[in-house]
Regions:
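Active-site-adjacent scaffolding segments
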Residues: 43-136
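Extracellular/lumenal glycan-associated surfaces
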Residues: 18, 35, 121, 207, ...
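Core segments of cupin and vicinal oxygen chelate
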Residues: 3, 7-10, 14-56, 93, ...
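Short loop/beta submotifs within extracellular cysteine-rich repeat domains
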Residues: 26, 36-38, 57-59, 68-69, ...
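Vicinal oxygen chelate
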Residues: 1-8, 12-21, 50-51, 64-90, 94-143, 168-185, 193-197, ...
């Protein structure tokens, strides 16, 4: 079991959440697919709840907030910060557009949302009582986060300026991809890449991969539970994966990492 109880290093993907048009339906879907249980919804925070795996927090769900009914349903990825004001200033200087003003979320921490210069939206989270994921890289928990954009070079420059990312190229000319490591990190924390050749006019964005024990079985659970599969299970260098969508069309990846990953 991979658990984490402290604040995550700055720049590390530390949280993901989703606004759902029907919270109960979405909770049921992810319970069936990933085995999640849930904390009580908190009315004072818009009905927000945490998804749990054996009591550890792995993601957040909330009803669609008032005034955001037309917003796309996507999994939002939050990058850790130990000083949200300082990192917000760096993001602005590096060309980001602020989408949601920074705010305190009760005793839990502070957050804001931005779009990087390539148009990919991301959040920042400065932890207080809520430090982010307390379980990762286990079935039901987040295994990987990355950002895919038509201009990965610009994205790399931006995140290096804001968070000090260092990169290791593992892609090629047809599909550039680099692993990023945060300052002081001893292993990659995520990735930045360009779209696959057959991706068409894919929108830039951060994505999340949830770990499962058996990708093929999980894909069948997605279908049975009312979701869809846009990319059938297949092997790749680092394991086996499939691309899925949930009840609101929100896209996510299911993956089983290779034992050597």
């Amino acid at each position: 079991m991979t658990t984490h109880t402290n604040s995550w290093p700055a720049g590390t993907p530390c949280w993901v959440d989703l606004m759902a048009s029907d919270l109960e339906r979405t909770q049921t879907f992810y319970r069936d697919v990933l085995g999640w249980t849930y904390s009580e919804s908190q009315p004072e925070y818009g009905g927000y709840c945490n998804a749990l795996v054996d009591g550890d927090v792995v993601a957040g769900l909330s009803p669609t907030m008032e005034g955001m009914e037309d917003a796309p349903h996507v999994w939002s990825v939050y990058l850790a910060t130990d000083d949200i004001a300082a990192h917000a200033a760096k993001a602005g200087h590096a060309g980001a557009t602020q989408l949601l003003e920074t705010m305190e979320v009760g005793p839990f921490g502070s957050m804001g949302m931005w779009a990087d210069p390539t148009g990919a939206a991301f959040g920042m989270w400065q932890a207080n009582e809520h430090t982010g994921f307390t379980r990762v890289e286990e079935p039901g928990a987040v295994a990987w986060c990355d950002v895919m954009t038509a201009d990965p070079a610009a994205a790399r420059e931006f995140y290096a300026a804001v968070f000090g990312y260092e990169y290791q190229d593992i892609g090629d000319d047809s599909m550039p991809y680099a692993l990023f490591t945060v300052p002081g990190g001893d292993r990659p924390a995520g990735g930045i890449g360009g779209p696959a050749p057959d991706a068409g006019d894919a929108q830039p964005g951060w994505s999340v991969a949830f770990q499962v024990e058996d990708v093929d079985a999980a894909a069948e659970r997605v279908r049975r539970s009312g979701g869809s599969i846009s990319s059938e299970p297949s092997d790749f260098e680092y394991g086996r994966m499939t691309v899925a969508a949930g009840p609101d069309g929100e896209v996510f990846v299911l993956m089983t990492p290779a034992e050597t990953m």
